[in-house]
């Protein structure tokens, strides 16, 4: 009972912090427009939109905290393909296999949260709020719910009409080294600092054995021997067996970076960030200073949320997030 009270009290404190942050943004002249988007986009047309999304996210995460990682991963897998246009939500049809049915996306979770928020919003403001905005807001709210930083994002994204399985080949592989990650993300406008900060999202969630078992077949000096035994034990249950990225799988903190320092990164693409001199100092900095990680992460997430957005005639506002109008 005491633990529950403390968690509820912490939520209240964090809510007050959010209010203070938003007030400070207003006072110092926070940029309310970005790339044709606006912080106040729904102020008149659907003022309850953000609260509805937040309620859907909070209710779902209270029932299943592991879904926080799913919502953050959903945003990344959406935005990195064709931009932040909710293409990841479209279902396959008899004439087209959509992104969500790619092997890279089969483990994505949280679609029902987006559906719930969209249905409730449509009941209040039909045809106004895009699915792309809901995905971006849901990821933001999931970060905060799990204990991470609060950040605001501009709204006004339109939903795309294309979702093809072949486009998912552009998603970064868990087998890339740091130089390859920097190159891949750099092509989309991200810095090495962004790459390391965004990788910190792995402080939440799990990886499946199929994504790291190759590290166990040959000696890997970058992998702690005791942790290697842990991974082997996990994989004994099959390719779909799950291994948490760090010791606090449902808490957004800097434990992920501490794990990398101890050669206990689950994915090759995780551990390479510590093994590579170009990114090691960033890992060490975030492991030492969680506040610095939080600040850089929210900046990188704003950038991710604004990636190649569609505006006006470039897209539409779907009535149902799973199909085009």
Curated annotation (Swiss-Prot):
Glycans are attached at residue 177. Ca(2+) 2 binds at residues 203, 246, 248, 253. It is an enzyme of class 1 (oxidoreductase). The keyword Disulfide bond applies. Its main location: secreted. Residues 1-36 form the signal peptide. The active site is at residue 77. Its EC number is 1.11.1.7. Keywords: Calcium, Disulfide bond, Glycoprotein, Heme, Iron, Metal-binding, Oxidoreductase, Peroxidase, Secreted, Signal. InterPro entries: Haem_peroxidase (IPR002016), Haem_peroxidase_sf (IPR010255), Peroxidase_pln (IPR000823), Peroxidases_AS (IPR019794), Peroxidases_heam-ligand_BS (IPR019793), Secretory_peroxidase (IPR033905). Pfam families: peroxidase. It is found in: Secreted. The record marks 73 as: Transition state stabilizer. One of its GO terms (cellular component) is extracellular region. One of its GO terms (molecular function) is heme binding. Ca(2+) 1 binds at residues 78, 83, 85, 87. Belongs to the peroxidase family. Classical plant (class III) peroxidase subfamily. There are 73 peroxidase genes in A.thaliana. This is Peroxidase 47. It comes from Arabidopsis thaliana. The lineage of its organism: Eukaryota, Viridiplantae, Streptophyta, Embryophyta, Tracheophyta.
């Amino acid at each position: 009972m005491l633990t529950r009270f403390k968690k509820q009290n912490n939520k209240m404190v964090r809510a007050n912090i959010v209010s203070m942050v938003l007030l400070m943004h207003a006072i110092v002249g926070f940029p309310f427009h970005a790339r044709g988007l606006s912080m106040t986009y729904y102020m008149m047309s659907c003022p309850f939109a953000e609260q509805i999304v937040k309620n859907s996210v909070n209710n779902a995460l209270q029932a299943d905290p592991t879904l926080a990682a799913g919502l953050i991963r959903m945003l990344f897998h959406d935005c990195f393909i064709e931009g932040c246009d909710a293409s990841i939500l479209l279902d396959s049809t008899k004439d087209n296999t959509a992104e969500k049915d790619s092997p890279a996306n089969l483990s994505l979770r949280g679609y029902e949260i987006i559906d719930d928020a969209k249905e409730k919003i449509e009941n209040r403001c039909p045809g106004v709020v895009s699915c792309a905005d809901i995905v971006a807001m849901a990821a933001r709210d999931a970060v905060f719910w799990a204990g991470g930083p609060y950040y605001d994002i501009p709204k006004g994204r339109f939903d795309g009409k294309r979702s093809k399985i072949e486009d998912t080949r552009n998603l970064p592989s868990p087998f890339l080294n740091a130089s390859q990650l920097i190159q891949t993300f750099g092509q989309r406008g991200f810095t090495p600092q962004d790459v390391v900060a965004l990788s910190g999202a792995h402080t939440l969630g799990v990886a499946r054995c199929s994504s790291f078992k190759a590290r166990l077949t040959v000696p890997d000096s970058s992998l702690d021997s005791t942790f290697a035994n842990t991974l082997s034990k996990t994989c004994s249950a099959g390719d779909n067996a799950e291994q948490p990225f760090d010791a606090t799988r449902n808490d957004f903190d800097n434990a992920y970076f501490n794990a990398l320092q101890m050669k206990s990164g689950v994915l090759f693409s995780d551990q390479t960030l510590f093994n590579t001199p170009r990114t090691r100092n960033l890992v060490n900095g975030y492991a030492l200073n969680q506040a610095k990680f939080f600040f850089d992460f929210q900046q990188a997430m704003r950038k991710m949320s604004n990636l190649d957005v569609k505006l006006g005639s470039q897209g539409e506002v779907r009535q149902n997030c799973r199909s085009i109008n």
